A protein has these predicted regions:
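12-transmembrane solute porter fold
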Residues: 1-168, 178-189
Length: 189
């Protein structure tokens, strides 16, 4: 129902924010997995453990963020989450081949905290902005924005890796190209 987008600014902008958020973040796990394995030389299991920083922090803070968005304006809580997410992306933009693993984990933890403060409160803002009869449509819009954002994120990351690394396998000789592709992705995000 397109009238929700044209007649309901909170719904429209919160939906757009969801699209932007998921487009900015979904490829982070793939990019950082490549970084940890090919730049830092970690085995896949160790890389996976480092990557856990984001979802663990997100899982720890999401329930509190949801409760906070019930007490405060969910749009403001989601905006704070988006700002913290942006900080996390800036921190990842600064990651290089000499960055210690704890810095990578800290940046991922910041992303997880931002994600927690954004996701539930943004969904709360969207669902609170529509009437009960539009819950189904609003819920499907949230799911669509999430899916389109995730697909966009992976498409951009794939194109950047292809553009910078090319068709060769990732190895020590093209680590600088991989780092450049990551920086472009995080910069776009």
């Amino acid at each position: 129902d397109m009238r929700l987008f044209s007649q309901n600014r909170v719904f429209a902008f919160s939906s757009l924010a969801a699209l932007i958020h998921y487009a900015a973040l979904f490829a982070v796990t793939m990019l950082m997995s490549l970084y940890l394995q090919f730049v830092k030389g970690l085995p896949p299991q160790a890389a996976g453990l480092v990557l856990l920083a984001q979802p663990v922090v997100q899982a720890l803070f999401s329930p509190a963020a949801g409760r906070l968005s019930d007490r405060l304006d969910p749009g403001r809580v989601a905006s704070a989450g988006m700002a913290i997410t942006t900080l996390g992306l800036v921190l990842l933009l600064l990651v290089g081949d000499g960055s210690p693993i704890w810095c990578v984990s800290a940046a991922l933890a910041v992303l997880g905290f931002g994600y927690a403060l954004f996701s539930s409160p943004n969904t709360n803002a969207i669902m609170s902005a529509v009437s009960r009869r539009d819950y189904g449509v609003a819920s499907s819009v949230v799911a669509t924005m999430r899916t389109v954002g995730m697909s966009t994120s992976m498409a951009v990351a794939t194109v950047m890796i292809s553009a910078f690394v090319g068709e060769t396998a990732i190895g020590p000789e093209n680590v600088p190209s991989l780092l450049q592709a990551m920086r472009v992705c995080f910069g776009i995000s």
